[in-house]
Amino acid sequence: MASRILVNIKEEVTCPICLELLTEPLSLDCGHSFCQACITANHKESTPHQGERSCPLCRMSYPSENLRPNRHLANIVERLKEVMLSPEKGQKVGHCARHGEKLLLFCEQDGNVICWLCERSQEHRGHHTFLVEEVAEKYQEKLQVALEMMRQKQQDAEKLEADVREEQASWKIQIRNDKTNIMAEFKQLRDILDCEESKELQNLEKEEKNILKRLVQSESDMALQTQSMRVLISDLERRLQGSVLELLQGVDDVIKRIETVTLQKPKTFLNEKRRVFRAPDLKGMLQAFKELTEVQRYWAHVTLVPSHPSYTVISEDERQVRYQFPIHQPSVKVNYFYGVLGSPSITSGKHYWEVDVSNKRAWILGVCVSLKYNAKWNVLRPENYQPKNGYWVIGLQNTNNYSAFQDAVKYSDFQIGSRSTASVPLIVPLFMTICPNRVGVFLDYEACTVSFFNVTNNGFLIYKFSNCHFSYPVFPYFSPVTCELPMTLCSPSS
């Protein structure tokens, strides 16, 4: 009932021309009302007769000045719109919000469901319309396809979102690691500079103590000389002021003493050439540090493999080896250099490890080629440590003699016309400004190089073997020689 009343009211406030709710309604003398825009357009289309026009519905003539706004209808239209836009106030589900009729038609052009009054309105005039039942299945299929497509796109979007989150997390980790590495490397640089500064200051303090000690001794000598002068002058003054007997008594000895007096000049060091401070080669230090940092990226986990238990002792963690003289054979003369190999074997790539040789008076380390782990544990003489024998090593002997072991040369290479083919061991002396407590070994298999670094001295290069011929698998090599102090493989964090 309420719906029917609402429809009747809508019919009363619907424009006969556009069939829509009245907009700015104008009323004629005949009582009919129209939208201001509709009646104005109608006036332009019709031919006026002596300034009069006719109503589009009843054709009753009226003067154009008699068009008057109908406020009452305008208010009704506003109230009606409020009711139509509020479903809880009376609008039925499935009914046109504008006309209150059932939504039974579908406008293909607008893609909306409409009622029969909407179909006849100017807004939908000429449009293709269908019963909703006729097009529902077609659009349901389309929407189902669209739904599947959107679900797939949603999955893709979620994956992209997850990828971005993962990349973001990865970047955060990388940046955090880079920050840590940068801080660590610059700390190492500062430590290097602090160490160099400390050494220079210590040298300066030693120089100061030495010079001041000598100057104090010189000052003491000058004080004794001055005191002896004072004693002699006092004796002369006493003789000159006393009697003749006092003047002449022992005068010859006094004169001889005066004649033998020689003024000793103090020992000074102004003209001595003292050590002039020179800033350390920071460029070289930084370059060495950069090279060391670069090769340390290839740090390998190396362990020791027992090869001759009678003369070498390996720790339980297989990272330390020391020499042990056989207790049951104390009189046996040791003719061999006993060593052990490291694991794993190397057949490609870049590998780096560090060895602590602190306080040892002798050691040999590097790499060697071998067909099996225990094939080359004994070397008869240090001269046999040669690349042609499969050894690329350096070592320390007699506490201070550092050497690299190169291939031997023949006497005939030095003596013209000599027929001798005897070999001269080529042991290359290595000069260390700072003795290494820790040695880094870097093997580049493809480049055929083996390099040794003095980690104790800021990573300066000790020696480098080039053009190495690796015909078999390569093993790290360690020989404690005959020194009972251990050689220890270092960890990256140590």
Curated annotation (Swiss-Prot):
Annotated metabolic or biological route of this protein: Protein modification; protein ubiquitination
List of residues that carry N-acetylalanine: A2
Record's keyword annotation contains Cytoplasm: yes
Alphabetical keyword list: Acetylation, Antiviral defense, Autophagy, Coiled coil, Cytoplasm, Immunity, Innate immunity, Metal-binding, Nucleus, Phosphoprotein, Transferase, Ubl conjugation, Ubl conjugation pathway, Zinc, Zinc-finger
A single MF term (Gene Ontology): ubiquitin-protein transferase activity
Catalytic activity reported: S-ubiquitinyl-[E2 ubiquitin-conjugating enzyme]-L-cysteine + [acceptor protein]-L-lysine = [E2 ubiquitin-conjugating enzyme]-L-cysteine + N(6)-ubiquitinyl-[acceptor protein]-L-lysine
Database matches in Gene3D superfamilies: 2.60.120.920, Classic Zinc Finger, Zinc/RING finger domain, C3HC4 (zinc finger)
Signal sequence residues: none
One Gene Ontology biological process: regulation of lipopolysaccharide-mediated signaling pathway
Any Pfam family: zf-RING_UBOX
Every B30.2/SPRY domain range: 280-494
Zinc finger (B box-type) stretch: 91-132
PTM: Degraded in a proteasome-independent fashion in the absence of viral infection but in a proteasome-dependent fashion following exposure to restriction sensitive virus.
Domain of life: Eukaryota
Domain characteristics, as noted in the entry: The B box-type zinc finger domain and the coiled-coil domain contribute to the higher and low order multimerization respectively which is essential for restriction activity. The coiled coil domain is important for higher order multimerization by promoting the initial dimerization.
Function: Capsid-specific restriction factor that prevents infection from non-host-adapted retroviruses. Blocks viral replication early in the life cycle, after viral entry but before reverse transcription. In addition to acting as a capsid-specific restriction factor, also acts as a pattern recognition receptor that activates innate immune signaling in response to the retroviral capsid lattice.
PANTHER family per UniProt: E3 UBIQUITIN-PROTEIN LIGASE TRIM
Family affiliation: Belongs to the TRIM/RBCC family.
Name listed for the protein in its UniProt record: Tripartite motif-containing protein 5
